[in-house]
Amino acid sequence: MGQKIHPTGFRLSVTRNWASRWYAGNSNFATMLNEDLKVRAYLKTKLKNASVGRVIIERPAKNARITIYSSRPGVVIGKKGEDIEVLKSALTKMMGVPVHVNIEEIRKPETDAQLIADSIAQQLEKRIMFRRAMKRAMQNAMRLGAQGIKIMSSGRLNGIEIARKEWYREGRVPLHTLRAEIDYGFGEAETTYGIIGIKVWVYKGDRLPSGEPPVDLTKEDDTKRRGPRRDDGKPSSRPRTARPEGQPGAAAAPGAAPAAKRVRAKKPDAAVDGAVPAEKAGE
């Protein structure tokens, strides 16, 4: 189940929160939801070069507050705040209520799943090899503190006629653990051969619903829980201790008779140089 479901939707109300936070009755719900979809599509097109990771929309009483998380806040704000004012007026006209726009900076864009997916998509559109782009993104994420990352690309990779999927993983990515903080991102690369989809999962550690960090497992505890592993990462059987030569498998009970020793009967030797067996000597 954890392998197929959307990681963010699977963890809602546990460790993750909704991207649209407002309440509406039955008569206004469809209208407000449609406005949210239009706003997100507009921001995705308008701020295509601003490296926007996610957008949160809140609707207090007869107002709207939009928080934009970007690794390049200067591109969103513009020179002397001109671009942000144009953006506010466009969003106010679109939503029909006063809109307040907040800009939050993403400190580590190399560990943000959505930014990683967008970066790989841009590289594929520039005809960079998909394996090189994926492995470079994984190395940067692990170097900056991610505990695990998985990247999957699907489509006509390298222009082949039959579409296929390829994925790479480094570290741990526990998709079925609810307390695991999994960041998920999706991007599309529009190449001359067609659209290539990129999915990214980034594991940033465990987090409890209360916000308290969980108890860290030591290396010995993790080995006892998971068992020893081989060099290729697959589980293996526990090593068996070598039995000393001549030592019985189990200790005999006191006073018990010694175990009988099994002796294999030897076959009679074949006749050598025409010798006759002893049984046939008198015939």
Curated annotation (Swiss-Prot):
BP terms from Gene Ontology: translation
UniProt keyword annotation of Ribonucleoprotein present: yes
Keyword Iron-sulfur among UniProt keywords: no
Pfam families xref list: KH_2, Ribosomal_S3_C
Compositional bias of kind Basic and acidic residues: 217-235
Gene3D superfamilies (UniProt xref): 3.30.300.20, Ribosomal protein S3, C-terminal domain (3.30.1140.32)
GO cellular component: cytosolic small ribosomal subunit
Span of domain KH type-2: 39-107
Compositional bias per record (Low complexity), positions renumbered to this chain: 244-260
Bilayer-crossing regions: none
Stored InterPro entries: KH_dom, KH_dom-like_a/b, KH_dom_type_2, KH_sf_prok-type, Ribosomal_S3_C_sf, Ribosomal_uS3_bac-typ, Ribosomal_uS3_C, Ribosomal_uS3_CS
One term of GO molecular function: rRNA binding
Region Disordered: start-end pairs: 209-283
Key words of the record: Ribonucleoprotein, Ribosomal protein, RNA-binding, rRNA-binding
Subunit architecture: Part of the 30S ribosomal subunit. Forms a tight complex with proteins S10 and S14.
Main function: Binds the lower part of the 30S subunit head. Binds mRNA in the 70S ribosome, positioning it for translation.
Family, similarity comment: Belongs to the universal ribosomal protein uS3 family.
Protein name: Small ribosomal subunit protein uS3
